[in-house]
A protein has these predicted regions:
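Carbohydrate transferase catalytic cores enriched for Leloir-type hexosyltransferases
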Residues: 1-380
Length: 380
C-alpha cells in the first residue's frame, strides 16, 4: 500500500498538527514497513523534529517540480492529484490542512483528520474562518473523517454535518521516548544541569493566557506540603511577564517558582520522572491530550483539569480537578500515601496500553483498507 499525506503543516509547522502527523507516520512506518508513506508539501522547510521520521526507509517527501511557479495551487488543486496517481498512491490522508479540491468527485480513497475541529488555536478569526472552510470542503470529499476523541467526533457531526457512520475516533499514541529507562544517577545530574528544585510539580507547554497557568500555581500553592515548588517549562511570553509573574508576587511563591526555557528532548522523560506530579490545567486541546498520555507513560503522577476529553484519555490513571483546593487535597493525599500513589501509577501504566504505536497503526491501516474496499465495491 502507498499512502499519501497532505504534509504542508507537518513539514513547515511545529504545532499540534505537525506533532500528530509525525507520531502517526512514525507508528505506521515502524509497524507496517512494507508500505510507503509519501508526504506532499508545496515547499521545504528545515525541521529538526522530522529527522527521525525521514530516517525511516518507507517514508518519502515530494515537492512540486521546479518549473511549477504557483506551488500552493499545485498543493490545493489538481497538481497534487496527478502526482499522487503517478506515485501509485492508494489512499490520500489530509491532516487539518484540508484535502486538495482535485480529489473531489474522483472517487479517490481519501481520509481527513481534524485535531481541532473548530480551529480555536488558529492565528486570529480570519485564519480560523479559512481553516473551517477548508475543513468543510474536506469533509465532503473524504470517505472517512477522523477525530481524536468522542467529544471532537460529536463536534464534527454537529458542526460539519457529517454522517455519524463516516466519523471515527482514532486516539493518538505516546511518544516512544517515554518508555526509556533512566539511571538513578541521572536525576541529580539533570537537577544541577537545569537548576531544578528538590521537590516540584511540572508544567510543560506554552506560557499563554489559554493555558490556565494561574490555576496551576494556585493549586501547587494550596498543597499541604509547602516545600513543593512549581516548575514551568516553556519560553517566556508577554502573558508570562505581565500576568504570571504578578501572580507569583500576589500569592508569595517567589521561593517555590521556577521557569525553564527549554529542556533537551532526551532529558524530558527523566525530568517527568523526577517531578512529584505533572499538572495539565487545560484539557480542551489536542496538545493537552498528548501531554496526559506522555506523562502517564513516563511514570509521573498526572493531575489535570476535569473534562470529558481528559477522562476519555486519562481513564483511571489521573487526578481530575475543577476546584483548586479540592484538587490540591487530592494530589496531597496521593503524594502522602505511597500505596495510593502506586495504585494510581499502575492504573496510568495500564491505561496507556490503549495508546501504543501498534494500536494506532493497526487502527489507521484498517481505515485505509476499508476506504480502498469501498472504492472497489463502488467501481464494481
Amino acid at each position: 500500500m502507498v499512502v499519501g499525506y497532505g504534509g504542508r503543516k507537518i513539514i513547515m509547522k511545529n504545532d499540534d498538527t505537525s506533532y500528530y502527523g509525525r507520531i502517526l507516520i512514525k507508528a505506521l512506518a515502524k509497524n507496517y514497513p512494507d508500505n510507503y508513506y509519501i508526504l506532499y508539501s508545496p515547499e521545504n522547510e528545515s525541521n529538526k523534529r522530522l529527522t527521525a521520521l525521514f530516517n525511516e526507509d518507507s517514508v518519502r517527501v515530494k515537492f512540486p517540480r521546479s518549473h511549477i511557479h504557483n506551488k500552493n495551487h499545485w498543493y490545493t488543486g489538481n497538481g497534487i492529484v496527478r502526482s499522487a496517481k503517478g506515485h501509485g498512491v492508494n489512499t490520500f490522508h489530509g491532516i487539518d490542512d484540508g484535502i486538495a479540491s482535485g480529489f473531489s468527485g474522483s472517487n479517490f480513497p481519501t481520509v481527513f483528520t481534524m485535531t481541532d475541529p473548530l480551529y480555536r488555536n488558529a492565528d486570529g478569526w480570519v485564519e480560523r474562518m479559512l481553516m473551517q472552510r477548508r475543513a468543510r470542503k474536506a469533509c465532503k470529499i473524504a470517505k472517512r473523517v477522523i477525530a481524536l476523541n468522542e467529544v471532537d467526533r460529536q463536534t464534527i457531526i454537529d458542526h460539519y454535518h457529517v454522517k455519524p457512520d463516516d466519523v471515527e475516533v482514532v486516539h493518538p499514541c505516546y511518544f516512544d521516548g517515554c518508555d526509556e529507562s533512566v539511571p538513578e544517577n541521572m536525576f541529580e545530574i539533570l537537577r544541577e544541569k537545569y537548576h531544578l528544585p528538590e521537590r516540584f510539580v511540572l508544567y510543560k507547554g506554552r506560557l499563554d493566557k489559554n493555558d490556565n497557568l494561574t490555576e496551576a500555581m494556585q493549586l501547587v500553592h494550596a498543597l499541604r506540603n509547602n516545600k513543593i515548588s512549581i516548575v514551568m517549562l516553556g519560553y517566556r511570553t508577554n502573558h508570562f511577564d505581565r500576568v504570571i509573574k504578578e501572580e507569583v508576587h500576589n500569592i508569595h511563591m517567589f521561593h517555590r517558582f521556577k521557569q525553564v526555557d527549554k529542556i533537551h528532548l532526551a532529558d524530558l522523560t527523566a525530568v517527568c520522572k523526577m517531578a512529584k506530579a505533572v499538572i495539565i490545567p487545560n484539557t480542551d486541546r489536542a496538545r493537552d491530550l498528548y501531554k496526559i498520555i506522555n506523562a502517564q507513560r513516563s511514570g509521573a503522577v498526572v493531575i489535570c483539569k476535569d473534562s470529558a476529553k481528559a477522562r476519555e484519555i486519562g481513564g483511571d490513571g489521573a487526578i481530575y480537578f475543577d476546584d483548586i483546593h479540592k484538587g490540591a487535597d487530592m494530589l496531597s493525599d496521593v503524594l502522602e500515601d505511597e500505596n495510593k500513589k502506586a495504585a494510581l501509577l499502575e492504573a496510568a501504566r495500564a491505561n496507556t496500553e490503549r495508546f501504543t504505536a501498534k494500536v494506532l497503526a493497526d487502527h489507521m491501516i484498517h481505515i485505509y483498507r476499508s476506504v480502498l474496499t469501498h472504492r472497489r465495491l463502488y467501481q464494481e
